[in-house]
């Protein structure tokens, strides 16, 4: 199969990129983000541009027309993108010289600079390279140990937290150095991903831009030691006295190694002090489109659809598979392939979420009757109050049949919860209730933990009348 031509500034094709999706070959426009299939098209730039313009012309509100853009604009799309490439016998390592983002590709494999740029910009959104005009003509980016601006001697909010991480004293965000030689820009980028709302973020970005063409390798020993500065007032933040401080061993033991993305997360993960502090309404993600965009770096192996996740109120935190509700602030990780975003949200909410109340029809029927306020998952043992209350004016349940399922009122209630023994629902509704509930399954009547379920068989005389 013939390959598309190399898209370079010289041939005016920098406006799009070629990517592997569910199509044999697809193109995404940098300007309007439209993705379209080019299977069967001639492998020419003009054919791709014509296909793009024909699609966008039929899209309401999309005014992007590549053919109307000047060549200078097209060529400029590549000019602010600089990587150092290290060659080995079998592969090339393409590395961003500012944030240490990297991508390994097989030697002699087909890829364009556009592909690499797109991957970088999505996985490292805070990297300043794509926003710095003075770097457009430079090819001299190299790692360095010195710089006109010595960040380590300047008063920054970064302090050494462990041998591999720093902590921002303004917002208490912990930033791990994920590379053997972390850079100052890399710490700023990771900080932006984890907490873009830090009051010192603009200050940090400006410092990072001042690095010019030299990338500062961050020696963690040059940062002030956070653990020894217990009485300093610099570390005050909006968290106040509620924040809990951990030493390095306690932090690793409680929260694990952030670099392990394959950890067996189960249900709601134990939240760090930062997660607890941020469990509030996030107005920046109140727009469903903003939430959907946050899933641009969602792990490819995850089966949940980004649009459905966004509609259910979730946005991606950028860490492992952890997501957060923009409205109630609940955080969840450890998604299974068949987990439903709406069901998980309902089952995991600590308090009644206004977003779920606003979208009651999206929640599976059997989950709408669970009263979480009387039986939150805060207790480790036994049940707690919170008996199910059913709507009295529901036409479907005005005259329920004897022995019918308390969720659908259509089938027999033939599933017993062990050990409490309550018979509440039918087999189908029970599966729907527990399919997305990975741990701490509770009886919806008495809130006792359900260890197992048992199908029961009723005599014909006891069948529904």
UniProtKB/Swiss-Prot annotation:
It comes from Ostreid herpesvirus 1 (isolate France). One of its GO terms (molecular function) is zinc ion binding. BIR repeats lie at residues 291-357. A zinc finger (RING-type) spans 405-447. InterPro entries: BIR_rpt, IAP, Znf_RING, Znf_RING/FYVE/PHD. GO terms for biological process: regulation of cell cycle. Keywords: Metal-binding, Zinc, Zinc-finger. This is Putative apoptosis inhibitor ORF106. Residues 373-393 are annotated as: Disordered. Residues 373-382 have a biased composition (Acidic residues). SMART domains: BIR. SUPFAM superfamilies: Inhibitor of apoptosis (IAP) repeat.
């Amino acid at each position: 199969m013939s390959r598309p031509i190399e898209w370079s500034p010289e041939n005016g094709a920098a406006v799009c990129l070629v990517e592997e999706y569910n199509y044999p070959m697809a193109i995404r426009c940098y300007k309007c983000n439209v993705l379209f299939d080019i299977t069967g098209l001639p492998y020419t730039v003009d054919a791709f541009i014509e296909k793009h313009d024909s699609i966008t012309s039929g899209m309401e509100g999309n005014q992007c027309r590549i053919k109307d853009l000047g060549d200078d604009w097209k060529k400029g799309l590549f000019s602010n993108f600089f990587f150092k490439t290290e060659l080995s016998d079998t592969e090339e390592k393409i590395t961003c010289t500012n944030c240490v983002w990297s991508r390994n590709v097989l030697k002699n494999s087909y890829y364009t600079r556009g592909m690499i740029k797109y991957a970088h910009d999505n996985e490292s959104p805070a990297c300043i390279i794509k926003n710095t005009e003075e770097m457009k003509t430079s090819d001299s980016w190299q790692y360095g140990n010195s710089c006109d601006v010595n960040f380590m001697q300047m008063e920054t909010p970064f302090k050494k937290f462990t041998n591999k991480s720093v902590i921002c004293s303004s917002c208490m965000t912990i930033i791990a150095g994920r590379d053997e030689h972390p850079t100052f820009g890399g710490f700023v980028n990771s900080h932006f991903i984890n907490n873009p709302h830090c009051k010192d973020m603009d200050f940090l970005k400006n410092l990072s831009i001042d690095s010019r063409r030299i990338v500062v390798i961050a020696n963690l020993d040059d940062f002030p030691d956070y653990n020894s500065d217990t009485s300093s007032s610099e570390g005050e933040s909006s968290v106040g006295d509620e924040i809990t401080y951990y030493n390095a061993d306690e932090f690793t033991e409680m929260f694990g190694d952030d670099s392990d993305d394959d950890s067996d997360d189960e249900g709601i993960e134990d939240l760090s002090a930062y997660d607890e502090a941020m469990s509030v309404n996030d107005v920046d993600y109140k727009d469903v489109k903003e939430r959907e965009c946050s899933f641009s770096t969602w792990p490819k192996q995850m089966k949940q659809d980004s649009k459905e996740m966004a509609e259910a109120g979730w946005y991606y935190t950028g860490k492992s598979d952890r997501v957060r509700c923009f409205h109630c602030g609940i955080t969840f990780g450890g998604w299974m392939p068949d987990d439903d975003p709406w069901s998980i949200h309902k089952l995991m909410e600590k308090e009644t979420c206004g977003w779920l109340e606003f979208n009651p029809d999206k929640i599976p029927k059997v989950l709408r009757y669970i009263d979480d306020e009387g039986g939150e998952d805060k207790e480790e043992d036994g049940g707690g109050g919170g008996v199910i209350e059913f709507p009295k004016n529901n036409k479907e349940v005005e005259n329920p049949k004897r022995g019918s399922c308390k969720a659908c009122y259509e089938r027999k209630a033939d599933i017993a919860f062990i050990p409490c023994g309550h018979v509440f629902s039918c087999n189908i509704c029970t599966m729907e209730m527990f399919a997305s509930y990975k741990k701490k399954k509770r009886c919806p009547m008495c809130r006792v933990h359900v260890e197992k379920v048992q199908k029961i068989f009723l005599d014909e005389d006891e069948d529904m009348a």
